[in-house]
């Protein structure tokens, strides 16, 4: 019996028709999953050949053998409430982080997205480390990229605009917008207290451009889609404050009103050209339920 669908809640059973090694057999039978994913399944102890648990990648299969992959085999799962792996291959991760955790820290004792991924890599016997490619603020949720080695991270950094061609956010803001769409541009610069200030004129800071499009208006709030030409620190929060529609739950650049119990900002879309395989990869997550208005 061959399973046509990769479903981690079902037991998968396959009959061996021709000689093969166990690792490539799993990759073929499970809808062409990556080598890394197949290794993770084997390492987890979920694979049985003729009733015997097998973790050996090159275990030799012969015709008429039965390969069984147990229920709840864990594919790309980390043991953390903060992070979910959306995509993984031998070069990089795409992850979705919750609001409330930082991406990385110089203090190794801090729990960060990076430290959680490094624990996952170690547990799954992958000899590499997670390298930060870009960041989201602690209180912003959404999609993030991490590389598995410095060379891949450097390829993103050297060709960021050409490689990562579409990043979009959704924001819940105070006020009912009337304008359907627009562009905000200014120079952004931090003061000594690390508060970012915006200026229409060059203030020695960095030029930033944010495009916005209204999604919905309801009862004193607006839901807005945002696309960035630049990725400056606090760019979206400062720019939305500039036009009089501060992000909900923002104590720094808004009034701090906590209607939804968090900052109303989520990175929902990420599209890029894989720097190694040249695949065009597109990822999108649902808007947080708390953003419903």
What is each residue range found by the language model?
Residues 2-293:
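RNA pseudouridine synthases
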């Amino acid at each position: 019996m061959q399973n046509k669908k990769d479903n981690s809640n079902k037991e998968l059973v396959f009959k061996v028709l021709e000689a093969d090694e166990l690792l490539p057999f799993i990759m073929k039978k499970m809808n062409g999953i990556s080598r890394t994913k197949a290794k993770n399944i084997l390492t987890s102890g979920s694979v049985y050949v003729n009733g015997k648990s097998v973790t050996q990648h090159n275990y030799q299969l012969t015709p008429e053998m039965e390969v069984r992959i147990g229920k709840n085999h864990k594919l790309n799962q980390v043991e953390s409430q903060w992070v979910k792996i959306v995509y993984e291959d031998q070069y990089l991760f795409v992850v979705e982080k919750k609001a409330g955790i930082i991406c990385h820290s110089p203090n190794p004792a801090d729990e960060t997205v990076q430290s959680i991924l490094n624990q996952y890599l170690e547990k799954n016997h992958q000899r590499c480390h997670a390298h930060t490619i870009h960041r989201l603020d602690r209180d912003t949720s959404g999609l993030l990229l991490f590389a598995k080695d410095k060379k891949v991270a450097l390829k993103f950094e050297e060709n960021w605009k050409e490689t990562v061609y579409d990043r979009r956010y959704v924001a819940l803001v105070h006020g009912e917008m009337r304008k359907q769409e627009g562009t905000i541009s200014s120079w952004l610069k931090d003061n000594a207290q690390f508060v970012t200030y915006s200026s229409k004129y060059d203030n020695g800071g960095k030029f930033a451009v944010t495009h916005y499009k209204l999604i919905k208006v309801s009862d004193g709030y607006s839901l807005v889609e945002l696309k960035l030409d630049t990725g400056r620190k606090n760019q979206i929060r400062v720019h939305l404050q500039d036009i009089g529609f501060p992000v909900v739950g923002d104590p720094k650049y808004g009034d701090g009103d906590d209607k939804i119990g968090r900052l109303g900002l989520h990175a929902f879309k990420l599209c890029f050209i894989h720097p190694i395989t040249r695949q065009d990869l597109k990822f999108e997550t649902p808007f947080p339920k708390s953003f419903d208005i």
